[in-house]
Each structure stands twice: as C-alpha cells, then as structure tokens.
Amino acid sequence: IEYRLVPDCQVYDQFTDVADAMTHIFQSLSKFQGDSEQIYGVADSGGAYLLTYVTAMTGCRPLAKAAHTTPPSFRLRALGLISGMFYTTRFDKIGLVLPRYLYGKHYKKTPFAPFTNAENKDLVSSLPPCFLVSSHNDNLEHYTLHFEKALSENHIPHKLVLFPQNKRLTHAFSVFDPFMKESTEAIMAMHQFFETV
C-alpha cells in the first residue's frame, strides 16, 4: 500500500493512510473471493512499524484515540515483520532525528507519548501472532531482537528467523532481492508460520 511520507506529514497521517488502505482491502474482499478470516499483514522497515501500530490499534482503543486514527474494524490473523523499524525515540541515529518529524515538537506532552515506546504493554499485548525476519548484517537487527523479547514477555505467539552474517543479507534483503536463496527461505518460513496460526 502507499502512504504519505515524513516530513510532508506526521506519523498520525501515515497511520490513517494504512488504516484506510486496510479497510478498503477488507471491503473489497468479496470482489476477489477473499476470505475475511485469512487476512495477514506483511511489511518491512518503517512500513513494519506502521503496520504494527495500526494492527495494535484494532485491539487497543487508547492507542487509536491517542493517534487520532480510526482503526480497521477487523483483526489481522498474523503479521510478517521484516527488518522492522520498531523504535523511533531511542538515543541513536533514528531517535535523534525522527521524533519531532513523526510526532511533532512537543510530543512528550501528548497522550501518544507512552506509545512511542514499541514495548508498551498495551500496544504489544494487542498484537496477533508475529513472524520476524532479520539478519546479522541488518542495521536494525537489534530492533528486531528487542521487539522479539517484548513479544515473549507479553506471551504473543511469534517466530524469529535471524540469518547469520553475510554481506548480501542487509536491511530488508528479502524485499529488495526476493529471489535470493535466503529470501525464498524467509518467505516460505513466513508462509508456513501463517498456515499454523
């Protein structure tokens, strides 16, 4: 799906774009003989962050309200999150630059502030089963590892596929080069996970 990009908008606009697209897909299922019980969401990098939050909003009304977003009226059965940019306010390259563009200058004083931490219990506990993919050469590998720990602590069914050091397996490699052997392995493992939830 397409969504507006920062700095032309804030993250709340992006959440709305994703939620609206999900709603449109759900409403269009009958045209394509889709099964409303078998809807999964897959995204990478910043899109994985947006998908995670909008999906959590379907089960966490305070999050949706704080984000000024009307969430989809249905739940995704599971998520596939590839090289997710889950953390936006840490003391790192992302956290030092993005927060004021994403959330606005005074976001720490808003109702959304507690949710800027992707490990927020209300947020994480509202997620469906998650399949995570990363690699040692992914610059956001540590984000995936920390988010996987949060899923474990909140008893969210999940699976992590972490590829070893390999200079070809960089950030979101399975999206940028889906025909690599490792990309096929990741995609097939995600498919198998989806079949079991």
Map each language-model feature to its residues.
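Alpha/beta-hydrolase superfamily serine-hydrolase fold, recognizing
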Residues: 1-197
